[in-house]
Curated annotation (Swiss-Prot):
Protein name stated in the entry: MOB kinase activator 3C
UniProt-listed InterPro entries: MOB_kinase_act_fam, MOB_kinase_act_sf
Organism encoding this protein: Mus musculus (Mouse)
Binding site for Zn(2+): 82, 87, 164, 169
Record SMART domains: Mob1_phocein
Entry keyword set: Metal-binding, Zinc
One example GO MF annotation: metal ion binding
Family classification: Belongs to the MOB1/phocein family.
Length: 216
């Protein structure tokens, strides 16, 4: 029998500290609206649509932070099964290998272990979310012109976490009775990125068959 989400994903398993929205802000109200829709049992395709009169950048920002929290929690639960020895390369099966590149330590694409890649990824996303120039939280402060491009890069890299977890650690998901919860999170993520064309279709190829099966 599948366990409830709180039982499956213990809070102390979070890979990085959970990001929260400031109460009283527009972003917080949007987050509450999105969560209420999720809990209402509405079709996930409907849940991700931009509410009338709302800013698309605010809507995307709320979801990027929420997906970061959720995927961070999923990977944190799997992390003990994802080691330097078990996953020496960040990959999605034999056909897909993901290399890390940033503006600091790895200026050229680097072949890294999955846990090292994940640690760098979560640090990188956390830095962007905490950067007021990228994710402004003050009323009246506009988003940067390249905001959606930044979010595309974040979401593309988060999708790779799903790829690695599904292909290399699905047995762990099953053993915890977490399949339904991870699938729901994936479907929510997938419908969102499709709704706003935020991830290149080629990036989705590793999970195409599974996606066609569960996101029909």
């Amino acid at each position: 029998m599948a366990l409830c989400l709180k039982q499956v994903f213990a809070k102390d398993k979070t890979f990085r500290p959970r990001k929260r929205f400031e109460p009283g802000t527009q972003r917080f109200e949007l987050y509450k609206k999105a969560q209420a829709s999720l809990k209402s049992g509405l079709d996930l395709r409907s849940v991700v649509r931009l509410p009338p009169g709302e800013s698309i950048d605010d809507w995307i920002a709320v979801h990027v932070v929420d997906f970061f929290n959720r995927i961070n929690l999923i990977y944190g639960t799997m992390a003990e099964h994802c080691s330097e020895s078990s996953c020496p390369v960040m990959a999605g099966g034999p056909r897909y290998e993901y290399r890390w590149q940033d503006e600091r330590q790895y200026r050229r694409p680097a072949k890294l272990s999955a846990p090292r890649y994940m640690a760098l990824l979560m640090d990188w996303i956390e830095g962007l979310i905490n950067d007021e120039d990228v994710f402004p939280t003050r009323v009246g402060v506009p988003f940067p012109k390249n905001f959606q491009q930044v979010c595309t890069k974040i979401l593309t890299r988060l999708f790779r976490v799903f790829v690695h977890v599904y292909i290399h650690h699905f047995d762990s998901i099953l053993s915890m009775g977490a399949e339904a919860h991870v699938n729901t999170c994936y479907k929510h993520f997938y419908y969102f990125i499709q709704e706003f064309s935020l991830v290149d279709q080629r990036e989705l190829e590793p999970l195409r068959e599974m996606t066609e099966r569960i996101c029909h």
